[in-house]
Every structure is written in structure tokens, then in C-alpha cells.
Amino acid sequence: MTIRKALSLDFLKPILELEYQIQQLSKISTYQQVVLDQELVSFKEQLSILKYEVFQSLTPLQRLHLVRQADRPTTLDYIPYIMSEWLELHGDRGGKDDPALVGGIGKLNNYTVIFVGHQRGKDTKDNVLRNFGMASPGGYRKALRLMQHANQFNFPILTFIDTPGAWAGIDAETLGQGEAIAVNLREMFSFDVPIICTILGEGGSGGALGIGIGDKILMLEYAVYTVATPEACAAILWKDSKRSLDAAEALKITSADLKVLGVIDKVVKEPIGGSQSNPSQAAYILKESLISELHFLTQLLPSKRKNLRYSKFRKIGTFYEGSEDYFG
């Protein structure tokens, strides 16, 4: 499943083909005892150069397709690498336990933290169970319960965002999807404890915002963050979903653009090839960033943190007319 999905991305085909050639040469060298060391070294050097060139020139839409891949690490892939000890907690205490939004308590370095995050599936069956990472009202209420627990016991909060958006089915609307997200926004501004939000893959619309209010917003290098998917934006503005490439460019969904615009605070580097190419290295880089930001935030008084958090989000949306260089 994962390989077939990767092959559907044209920009990855040269990399996958070269990786296949390296695998075949390695097998020949191993099983036929043929010395191919120089050839293998040469191919691996070519692969490193090719990966660098491809991933340095990704378009916004290519980044979106990349983070939608099944092998992209999810919240529950990162947690065992980041936390030395952790325990998943369940339920919103209202009869729901949404598997699309997970959370728990864990140990990050010397900090006891509460974490919540969207959870996508790894295959068709898992994606159906996880609703493709689209959380229901019960999921956001579960997240709120855990974050209130963190605030009560003075535990920092870490959120991990990776969703195409909140679930928009009739049942979700009946159960108060908009209200659940709105309450989370209000409450997250009021919490005294440090909050760090990290966009792991796809940060989509209100589904992302439901756990996206924090003192620091981190974003993985190839992740995207958008008010609407490029496909939806193209359909709304131009009545043509095929113009998703134009929409992706206009929406400024990449980490570099959002850093310039002040929507996020820090871009977290990924291994060449994306976090899916080396999950453990990607997790290590993210862990170091989280520890550094937590160390800074814990030095501030709660009132100072809340004021800075409020001011940060009040500034988002400021724009400058007639400044083409600013918007790229």
C-alpha cells in the first residue's frame, strides 16, 4: 500500500528508481560475492544529491501530497521516540472516545507533560477506524479534558497537528462540532501552563485550530498549514478543482511562507527525504526543539505567557498591500 502510494507521486519516481537499483546491486554483491563497493558508493552519492535537489525544489502542492503519504510518521509514531515514559488516556467523559484524536501523559526529558494529537491510519482499515485523522466533537472534548487536567496539575501541554480538517458529517454537526472547537480555542487561551503546538503533516482548517492555540507553534519543514485544502479552495474560487496548484501557491501553506507571515514561530528541519525517510532522526530533531522551547517557556510567569499567547494570535492576519517582495 505505502509503496504504491509513493509511486503515484511523479516527483519521487527518480528517487525510488535509484533506491531500487542500489538494493539490487547490494543483493548481487551479497549473494554472488561480487565486489561492487565503488559502484554502490557512487550510486549512494547520486541518491543523496538527487534527494537534496528534489526536496529543495518541492512546490506547495507537492509538499501536500508528500505529507499525505501513508508512511509519514503520525503522533503515535513520534511519542515513543520523544517520551521516555508515556501512557495513552481515553474518553471525553461524555460517552465518546474518538480514535482520530489521541492523548495521554508522558515524560519528556525532566518534564511531565500532557500530549494530544490527531492520529491518521496506516492502511485502509486503520484509516477507516481513525476516520482519516478527522476528529469528531468527542475527540476535541477528549482533548479539552486532558488539557484541563494538565492545567490543574501544572503540566505543560504538547499538541501534534495532522489532519485534513475536522469531521464534517451530519452526526458531527448534530453533536456540536463548531461549539467543541470554539470552546477549545477559548480555553486554550486561558490556560496557565506552557502550550507548544507542532504541525507534523497536514494542518487543515478548524480541525487543526481545535488543538492549535499555543505559546509556540512549531512546524515540520515539509508540513503544510492551511485554512482550506487547495482542492477545496480551487473549487470555491474558480469552480475548478484542477486549479489546485494555483490555489496552493496563493494560500501560502508552506512552513517557509508561514514563518515569514508570523503564523508559526519555528520551522523544524526534517531529514532529506522527509520524516518518513528516517523517523527516528526526525523525532530526535523534534524532541530537541520541544525541550528547548519548554525550557524557555517554563521560565516565564503564567500571566506573562498568557499575555504573549494572546498578543501573538492578535497579530496573525496583518498584511501589507503593494509589497510583492514580502509575499514572494
UniProtKB/Swiss-Prot annotation:
This is Acetyl-coenzyme A carboxylase carboxyl transferase subunit alpha. One of its GO terms (biological process) is fatty acid biosynthetic process. It holds the Pfam family ACCA. It is an enzyme of class 2 (transferase). The keyword Lipid biosynthesis applies. SUPFAM superfamilies: ClpP/crotonase (SSF52096). The gene is accA. It is found in: Plastid, Chloroplast.
